[in-house]
């Protein structure tokens, strides 16, 4: 999973300046310029962190993440229903956005970088991921 995708090319720093490298206008590309198969593209109805196209989490990735969350929650006595799963239940995709209480350590539970840092893109609100989080 590469995160956000761009259509028609990708941005690259050349001589210290961001430049858009044009490619096939009908294709999606990762931030490194790798072509992404259409079956691995998720188009969000509402942009997340400025992007609507994202590299899809596979069913196997979501299943593995589910098992990992359960394991870490049990091992470290973390209430995995608090934090991100709670916010996704309340606000849907907006639950993935920055949360100042999480940033300042006032929230105990399951968090991710996008909740605590405005410059991170490591998780995005794919419906299957949100469904898994709500099921916790």
Where are these regions (language model features)?
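Basic/polar, cationic surfaces and motifs that engage anionic cell-wall
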Residues: 3-136
